[in-house]
């Protein structure tokens, strides 16, 4: 009998704690702007510093999880997140808020890195990452429905800190280290040993493209709240409801990506999906009422996790140990970090519609190298109906990463290997009585 499939709930919870800060970025930036009397650019800069700190943790710790131990790093990250975000929520002094956001961001990045690395080593990474995405989207949606009805600049920061504290007890079920058989298995799975990264050129191109791709996404996400309030003339509670519905649509996107699997390969979802996202960004940035604003945000948040999941799947297919998944995810986090400030500056200088047009054109240009990598890089193959996935940092989105745990499977479309008949010499014994049993027999001459 097969062993029952277990759910790695500690990794799901850690994934949720790490990804919650980027999901709450629009309301965090908006609350800082109104609650601390900051300009839009200043509030966007605080959000960028938070995400930059998170990305830095990913770059620094991507190769250290195995040596240091998942439990130790996860607890460190959760402590930093609780202390940093909690301190920023309890003070109104701007330098202290900035310092707390930076410390908390590093904690979020640490938790995300541990979760991504461990999920990549799971027998069924798709299931764990999909549950993590569903969890963080549901939690963020609940916050978006609650926060607009309460005053204060630090509510979203406090929500992230409390989530980190709630996840802490589950870290006792994480391993103290990933050395030994797991490390040897991961090293052997990609055939590269313990140090050399495979597919370096494709990985670097994908990392650079992901940085710009994420920058464009989060340039809009960081100012979406202001677009809804200032340009579409909606109330903050209404904008919160739109965001909650959009995140709910994102849940459908995650489930759709899992159901779609490998049927369309990777190139079409990545290239075609990015084109659709570009149109959604242009629509949302030029919205002047509830209909256009909601349509742009909901459509965008539906397609975004689908494309992101295939991008992370492409990164994970380049290295079975999950190193490219973490490094590409960290590059994505750098773009995410620069997004709020970029969106604030562009919108302040040229207005929201022009900002949306610039971001849309940039996405169309970035789609070309990403699609090229998907077309020309083999990595681990996509197999029809495959449910085993390889995931990594960001985001988001490890959920529809597709691959197999071994490189010994032929690519889809590869010619079948011929079956060769091997002739055997001799003829079988005609009678079964020619054979004796394996039981003990009398010795020669015995009675």
Kindly give the residue locations of the regions a language model identified:
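Helix-loop-helix hairpin linking two adjacent transmembrane segments in secondary transporters
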Residues: 122-126, 130-179
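Conserved MFS/SLC helix-loop-helix module at the cytosolic interface between two early adjacent transmembrane helices
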Residues: 56-94
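C-terminal transmembrane helical hairpin of 12-TM major facilitator-type secondary transporters
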Residues: 261-311
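Structural signature of the two symmetry-related core transmembrane helices
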Residues: 72-86, 268-283, 357-360
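Intracellular juxtamembrane helix-capping segments at the cytosolic ends
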Residues: 109-123, 303-320
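Cytoplasmic helix-loop-helix junction between adjacent transmembrane helices
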Residues: 94, 100-135
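A late C-terminal transmembrane helix in Major Facilitator Superfamily
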Residues: 15, 19, 318-360
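Helix-to-loop junctions at the C-terminal end of transmembrane segments
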Residues: 56-72, 120, 252-266, 347
């Amino acid at each position: 009998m097969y062993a029952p499939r277990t759910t790695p709930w500690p990794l799901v919870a850690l994934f949720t704690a790490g990804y919650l800060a980027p999901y709450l970025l629009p309301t965090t930036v908006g609350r800082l702007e109104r609650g601390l009397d900051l300009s839009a650019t200043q509030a966007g800069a605080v959000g960028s510093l938070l995400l930059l700190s998170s990305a830095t943790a990913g770059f620094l710790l991507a190769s250290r999880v195995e040596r240091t131990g998942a439990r130790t790093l996860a607890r460190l990250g959760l402590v930093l997140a609780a202390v940093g975000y909690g301190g920023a929520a309890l003070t109104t002094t701007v330098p202290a808020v900035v310092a707390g956001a930076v410390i908390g961001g590093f904690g979020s990045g640490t938790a995300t890195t541990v979760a991504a690395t461990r999920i990549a080593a799971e027998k069924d990474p798709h299931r764990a990452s999909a549950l993590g995405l569903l969890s963080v989207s549901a939690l963020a949606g609940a916050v978006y429905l609650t926060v607009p009805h309460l005053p204060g600049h630090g509510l979203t920061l406090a929500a992230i800190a409390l989530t980190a504290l709630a996840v802490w007890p589950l870290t006792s079920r994480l391993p103290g280290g990933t050395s030994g058989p797991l490390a040897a298995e991961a090293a052997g799975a990609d055939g590269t040993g313990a140090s050399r990264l495979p597919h370096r050129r494709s990985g670097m191109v994908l990392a650079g493209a992901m940085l710009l791709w994420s920058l464009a996404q989060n340039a809009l996400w960081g100012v979406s709240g202001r677009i809804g309030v200032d340009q579409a003339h909606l109330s903050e509670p209404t904008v919160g409801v739109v965001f909650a519905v959009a995140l709910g649509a994102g849940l459908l996107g995650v489930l759709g990506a899992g159901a779609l699997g490998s049927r369309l390969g990777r190139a079409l979802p990545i290239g075609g999906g990015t084109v659709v996202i570009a149109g959604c960004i242009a629509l949302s940035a030029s919205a002047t009422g509830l209909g256009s604003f909601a349509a742009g945000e909901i459509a965008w948040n539906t397609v975004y996790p689908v494309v992101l999941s295939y991008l992370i799947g492409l990164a994970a297919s380049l290295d079975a140990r999950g190193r490219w998944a973490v490094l590409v995810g960290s590059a994505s986090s750098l773009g995410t970090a620069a997004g709020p400030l970029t969106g604030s500056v562009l919108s302040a200088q040229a207005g929201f519609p022009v900002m949306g047009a610039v971001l849309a054109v940039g996405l169309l240009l970035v789609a070309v190298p990403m699609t090229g990598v998907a077309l020309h890089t083999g990595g681990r193959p996509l197999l029809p109906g495959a449910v085993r996935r390889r995931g990594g940092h960001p985001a988001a989105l490890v959920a529809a990463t597709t691959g197999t745990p071994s490189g010994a499977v032929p690519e889809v479309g590869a010619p079948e290997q011929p079956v060769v008949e091997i002739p055997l010499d001799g003829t079988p014994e005609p009678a079964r009585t020619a054979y004796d049993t394996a039981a003990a027999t009398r010795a020669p001459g015995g009675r």
